[in-house]
Amino acid sequence: MGKEVMVSDYGDDDGEDAGGGDEYRIPEWEIGLPNGDDLTPLSQYLVPSILALAFSMIPERSRTIHDVNRASQITLSSLRSSTNASSVMEEVVDRVESSVPGSDPKKQKKSDGGEAAAVEDSTAEEGDSGPEDASGKTSKRPRLVWTPQLHKRFVDVVAHLGIKNAVPKTIMQLMNVEGLTRENVASHLQKYRLYLKRIQGLTTEEDPYSSSDQLFSSTPVPPQSFQDGGGSNGKLGVPVPVPSMVPIPGYGNQMGMQGYYQQYSNHGNESNQYMMQQNKFGTMVTYPSVGGGDVNDK
């Protein structure tokens, strides 16, 4: 852009630099460079407005740091609201599924893999056999067997929560039984609610799960099960944490489970016989399908 010139001292007869050389090297970098007034300001558009209008070019408004901060706050607020809405929606779905008669929780999808999980109760009858695969081996799925001990634990948890506050997800967490799924609890809770209505005489409709009455009648119904808040006088208490379950090695296709019953806080109701007992869990049994098919594939 510029150039350097050597200025000699013409008064020196020897032709040597009077000042020793570099002192007389004059930089001319600024010669010919535009000044600040000659430069195009950054706020000015490079394309003239008339030309932009001819090509339908609409100039965008320049963004400031305040615009960036405002957009960031709006994005964070929308993310927080969507997270809260999803958690509230999950709780509402749990209550609707457990309270509406005729709803089929078996058609719900598992949250981890998104695959449909068909779960059959112990009172379901053996179905027709399905086709075998190419290797001649039939697929096997675990089926939950609701034993009287496991049903007793279910009844105690429902009595603690109250029949109106009991939802499948909370019951599953308080029961703390290894291998028990939300679909198992939702199906059993629906049948148990119909059973309670029948023994109270609140409904005359036919029970499609009449085969479960023998299991339900094996355990007395606690009086607090009919209350809104169960044994907590309308308020959900904080239960004592349950010890982790220890699976027992089984034989063949059987899996054993054993643990200790949780002692719930009863808020003054110390004589409640359903809250202070120790209990054993039922067993999770993997039944082979009869005739080469899976009973869940009906």
From Swiss-Prot:
Cell compartment(s), UniProt: Nucleus
Keyword Nucleotide-binding: no
Ranges of biased composition (kind: Basic and acidic residues): 104-113
Record's compositionally biased regions (Polar residues): 209-227
Gene3D superfamilies named among the record's database cross-references: Homeodomain-like (1.10.10.60)
Annotated PROSITE patterns: HTH_MYB
GO molecular function, one term: DNA-binding transcription factor activity
GO BP annotations listed: circadian rhythm; regulation of DNA-templated transcription; regulation of flower development
Swiss-Prot/TrEMBL keywords: Biological rhythms, DNA-binding, Nucleus, Transcription, Transcription regulation
Composition bias, Acidic residues: 10-20, 122-131
Superkingdom of origin: Eukaryota
Pfam families in alphabetical order: Myb_DNA-binding
InterPro entries to which the protein is assigned, alphabetical: Homeodomain-like_sf (IPR009057), LUX/BOA-like (IPR044841), Myb_dom (IPR017930), Myb_dom_plants (IPR006447), SANT/Myb (IPR001005)
Region (Disordered): 1-26, 79-143, 206-232
Start-end of DNA-binding region: 138-197
An example Gene Ontology CC term for this record: nucleus
Function (record text): Transcription factor that is a critical component of the regulatory circuit of the circadian clock. Binds to specific sites on CCA1 promoter leading to CCA1 activation. Is required for the rhythmic expression of other clock genes such as LHY, GI and APRR1/TOC1.
Name of this chain's protein: Transcription factor BOA
